[in-house]
Amino acid sequence: MSELIEHANAIEWRFERQILRLEPWGKNSLRVRATCAPEFTSALHALLTPESCQAEILRDAETLTLRNGNISAVLNLKGQLAFYNQRGELLLEEMWRQRSTVGIGASEKSQDKYVSALKLDGREFKPLPGGKYQLTVRFEARQGEKLYGMGQYQQPWLDLKGCSLELAQRNSQASVPFVQSSLGYGLLWNNPAIGEASFAKNHSQWTSRVTQEMDYWITAGDSVMEITRQYAKATGTPPAAPEFISGLWQCKLRYRTQQEVLDVAREYHRRNLPLSVMVIDFFHWPNQGTWCFDPVDWPDPRAMVEELESMGIRLMVSVWPTVEARSPLFPQMKAKGWLVTSDRGVQVNLDFMGNTTFFDATHPQARQFVWDTVKKNYFDYGIKLFWLDEAEPEYRAYDFDNYRYHAGPVLEVGNRYPRDFAQGFYDGLRAEGENEIVNLVRCSWAGSQRYGVLAWSGDVHSSFHSFRNQLAAGLNMGLAGIPWWTTDIGGFQGGNIHDPAFHELLIRWFQWAVFCPVLRMHGYREPRI
């Protein structure tokens, strides 16, 4: 027989090996976890430890209710779960299709009680070798509901109802699994595993391919602003942004030398054109994984920084997570376990301009080592802005089942990599006394915003089709809690500078980009270098 258990400030359901636990987690919010292990892990994932709040617990013969401000969760003896707002209106309910279940939400209150022989549970743990599980969680679909957020996907739809979204990081795709509903709730899938979220007409479904437990956070609010505020309180707010980031950023693939950078900056200054930031792209280094300037082309970085600052221009440099065997740092990083490993085959993650492996951003010591190297070779010259490119990271083949981080297999923890990459630089800058921290990062996960992330949409195509996709991508990134976001004006690849159609695209993209959080030029144009 199942049990409904009251705790001082939480409720639980137990049956066979499964434990379901609900507890208050911030204003008008609940954290919901389930496991088939003897106890829950201590992992917070995207969440921060909340301020203490006392929930109300109500019991009747068949249910336990946990009420925290404007949200209530009702849990019955069969383990079914539904959420309501302060007016008693149904927000969300699990989908069960069993002969013995009739639904705990609105369907139970109707005269037409519906049972099913499909044998589908609202929470499904499928055992995997090694003691982990493949998790599926199902919710009832609601007619007329609109859904927003979830990060950045290359598609034109702002309303995600009807969409199937891969929960994985790819170049131009950022999985930030927080969804906001027009019914007045927000839900964070608090799990960094590779998986899928499907918001179909018949039901919604979340899957994690490898995990130890189910973990999500749900909040209720009467407006998008209220829901977003509660989410930011739960996962972190971005640091104060310096005023200069709202100006023009000059960037391209690529400036090859110190002289090229200074020539462009001097011409802006001569024409009295305001310029906030100049960006030095990749391969200004001697080898991947050295994180320093090549002295042949960049003989005096300190003098370059000082001259740019005299013209009111800040300098940003690109930092890739790639490390090649020719790097003098490779042997130490490999020996210390600071590189991503492969479970099978050759340990090569990306073969762009060399066979490289990514440093393991989930490893605290690896993050510190990379920052210490960056501090010595960039920050100490006066460079305080960093472009964390390839931050997904971008594998040569996205065989997520083949790679392993310090934090665990990529299938289980992979989506946290861009957040941890950003955290290493945020922590390093904070330790040096910096408070206004903004770093350009080519990916995000839930909680990235608290590490000063300015996300951008990656290597998108130079076309009106792609341009249309960015409109939805940027809005949904903001609704997923990543407020600082930008694009490559005109798209990254495919633009012909001699084509009048591309001129039109570039002008329209510029006109729109003025109203984005950051106005940044970038692209791969002729002459190609």
From Swiss-Prot:
Coiled coil: none annotated. Its EC number is 3.2.1.-. InterPro entries: Gal_mutarotase_sf_dom, Glyco_hydro_31_N_dom, Glyco_hydro_31_TIM, Glycoside_hydrolase_SF, Glycosyl_Hydrolase_31. It is an enzyme of class 3 (hydrolase). CDD domains: GH31_N (cd14752), GH31_xylosidase_XylS (cd06591). GO terms for biological process: carbohydrate metabolic process. Signal peptide: none annotated. Keywords: Glycosidase, Hydrolase. The active site is at residues 389, 392, 459. It comes from the Bacteria. GO terms for molecular function: carbohydrate binding; hydrolase activity, hydrolyzing O-glycosyl compounds. Pfam families: Gal_mutarotas_2, Glyco_hydro_31_2nd. The keyword Hydrolase applies. Belongs to the glycosyl hydrolase 31 family. This is Uncharacterized family 31 glucosidase ORF2. It comes from Pseudescherichia vulneris (Escherichia vulneris).
